[in-house]
Amino acid sequence: MGQKSNPIGLRLQINRTWDSRWYAEGNAYAKLLAEDIEIRKYILETAAQAAISKVVIERPAKLCRISIYAARPGVIIGKKGADIEKLRQKLSTMTESEVKLNIVEIRKPEIDAKLVAQGIADQLIRRVAFRRAMKRAMQSAMRLGAEGIKIVCGGRLGGAEIARVEQYREGRVPLHTLRANIDYAEAEALTAYGIIGIKVWVFKGEILGHDPTAQDRLMMEAQTSGVRPAR
């Protein structure tokens, strides 16, 4: 089943946790869920150049705490913090509550699955050969500390008449091992020939012991230390 399941969903409460962390009763759940979707959509559209990997939303009491994981945090913050203040005010209006923003820098975007997938999609839109884009991404990931990476592209690759799927893998990607720290993401490239789908799996080592917050903790430690997270 490891081959067919979403690697993140399979590892929830083992070494991963949810990106939306709050509890709601009754009809409030649907309202807050729709609000989360709108918040993420607005942030990704507003700071499209910031290379955002994920947005974590927490709602303790009447507060909304939003953590944005980005490779280029300066794009979000802006000159003297002007842009981040505008963003905070807009999100506060959307949520009708006080908003606290936390920007987390991703020091190694080459081993972040979401940024790798989006980078390949951007290259395909610019008509870069799909094999070159995939192999370049794999080489960069392995060079910067990934223990394994798998990339799958599907669609009218290279403008072919018949759609097909091609995949490349380097190193180990143990999908059945639940303690494996596997980052997974999908992206779409809107090319002149149609949509090309990209899936990326990045294996970053094993996390021993039960720790649902391990993934976020390792990313925070990498930000403060500036070195590769310990396995």
Swiss-Prot record:
InterPro entries: KH_dom, KH_dom-like_a/b, KH_dom_type_2, KH_sf_prok-type, Ribosomal_S3_C_sf, Ribosomal_uS3_bac-typ, Ribosomal_uS3_C, Ribosomal_uS3_CS. It comes from Erythrobacter litoralis (strain HTCC2594). It comes from the Bacteria. One of its GO terms (biological process) is translation. Binds the lower part of the 30S subunit head. Binds mRNA in the 70S ribosome, positioning it for translation. Residues 39-107 form the KH type-2 domain. Keywords: Ribonucleoprotein, Ribosomal protein, RNA-binding, rRNA-binding. Pfam families: KH_2, Ribosomal_S3_C. Belongs to the universal ribosomal protein uS3 family. GO terms for cellular component: cytosolic small ribosomal subunit. Coiled coil: none annotated. Part of the 30S ribosomal subunit. Forms a tight complex with proteins S10 and S14. The keyword Cytoplasm does not apply. This is Small ribosomal subunit protein uS3. One of its GO terms (molecular function) is mRNA binding. The keyword Ribonucleoprotein applies. NCBIfam families: rpsC_bact.
